[in-house]
Design a protein with these regions (language model features):
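Catalytic grooves of carbohydrate-active enzymes
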Residues: 150, 210-281
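His/Asp/Glu-enriched short active-site or ligand-binding loop at hydrolase and phosphoryl-transfer sites
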Residues: 175-204, 212-222, 275-285
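Metal-dependent polysaccharide deacetylase catalytic core of the NodB/CE4 family, i.e.
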Residues: 30, 43, 50-169, 185-193, ...
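Short acidic, Gly/Ser-rich segments with clustered Asp/Glu that frequently serve as metal-coordination loops
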Residues: 38-44
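C-terminal beta-strand-rich structural cap/linker in extracellular carbohydrate-active enzymes
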Residues: 313, 338-357
């Protein structure tokens, strides 16, 4: 809220306010459809969701538990049936992501581990809801990533812990094991609907390159998800006021009302929202985060210079409504008008835009 307040203050008071949009291609809000595959029947059910998503041009993220140990929680469902499902998800354009090995309710209290954990020697065992034996943070991350990449044929760069258990060592553990993005907390707990950068040990002294993408709505609260379509759309409408992130978590343990919720929700927002995977949005956000903007102005003209160290598509610039483009460098750069300004379709390393005020 404080950052949004300062942004609005800047836009109201600055003589030449220019800000970067928070949604690719100037859409009203970004929507991430994410699934936690952590139950015996969820693997098969995931395909029903995936086929629907592909049919409407939506790519989703499937956070998949690699459960190869039978224990208190469930049978060992990551077996010979899993690889064909993973490969079909990948073929449909979806992202494969890690949801740990054990899905332990006490993952936040696991020791960090050695960084040498590997399959099949790593054998975490959930004995009760509050007791897991043989688990470590690095083991959960290393082994799940290895198996998903081995059988899914896709690099795994996004992570979500079971039960959103969030150990203090998670940011540096993500770095150490090759992940780039996290979706491990709710928006309510983190008090923001925007991505944010994680700090070492979740403290204040050192940033990591990992960004967190908090969960907005999940399917385990009451009333049942199928009865919450309008409530979810109401949240989306509020987030669209400032380009906040809508990260929807749906467990594919059943289809029924959950799948119908997704159908109705996606259909309603498709005309105004940007949909993509966690990796797609996170890659875009990290590139946007490094863009530098410099504004010069006179009585009748303004010049905006952008420096973009990383490849970036669909960057929206929010500009005063009376500005009109006079010239562009490099020549031929494709600009598209948007509701709040304009969109640069493909951002080169350096851009200079001249406007008449």
């Amino acid at each position: 809220m404080l950052l949004r307040f300062f942004k609005e203050l800047y836009r109201a008071a600055a003589p030449a306010p220019v800000t970067l949009g928070t949604v690719p291609f100037g859409r009203q809000l970004p929507v991430l459809i994410t699934h936690d595959v952590d139950f015996e029947r969820s693997l098969t059910n995931a395909l029903a969701y995936a086929e629907f998503e592909a049919s409407v041009g939506v790519r989703a993220t499937y956070f998949t538990q690699v459960k190869y140990v039978r224990d208190f929680n469930d049978v060992a469902f990551f077996n010979s049936n899993a690889p064909p499902v993973l490969q079909r998800l990948r073929a449909l354009g979806h992202e494969l992501a890690s949801h740990t090995v054990s899905h332990s309710k006490v993952f936040a209290r696991f020791p960090l581990g050695t960084g040498t954990e590997r399959y099949p020697d790593y054998q975490p065992f959930v004995r009760t809801p509050i007791l897991t034996i043989g688990g470590s943070v690095l083991g959960e991350m290393r082994v799940s990533k290895f198996l998903l990449e081995q059988f899914g044929g896709q690099e795994v760069v996004s992570f979500r812990p079971g039960h959103l258990q969030n150990p203090y060592s998670l940011p540096q553990a993500l770095m150490a094991t090759g992940y780039r993005h996290s979706s491990s907390v709710t928006a309510n707990d983190s008090l923001t609907h925007l991505p944010f950068q994680l700090n070492y040990d979740r403290a204040r002294t050192a940033e990591t390159p990992i960004f967190e993408f908090p969960v907005t709505i999940e399917d385990e609260a009451q009333p049942p998800l199928g009865q919450r379509v309008q409530a979810a759309l109401d949240v989306a409408r509020e987030l669209a006021r400032y380009g906040g992130l809508m990260n929807v978590l749906i467990h594919p343990d059943i289809t029924g009302h959950k799948l119908q919720f997704e159908r109705d929700f996606v259909t309603a927002l498709k005309p105004v929202a940007w949909f993509g995977t966690v990796n797609e949005f996170a890659t875009w956000w990290a590139a946007r985060n490094e863009v530098a903007a410099d504004v010069e102005y006179s009585a009748n003209f303004a010049a905006v210079t952008l420096t973009a160290p990383r490849p970036l598509n669909g960057l929206a610039l929010q500009l005063p409504s009376d500005w009109r483009v006079q010239s562009v460098q490099p020549a031929g750069l494709k600009l598209t008008p948007s509701e709040a300004g304009l969109v640069i379709e493909q951002v080169p390393p350096s851009v200079r835009l001249i406007f008449r005020r």
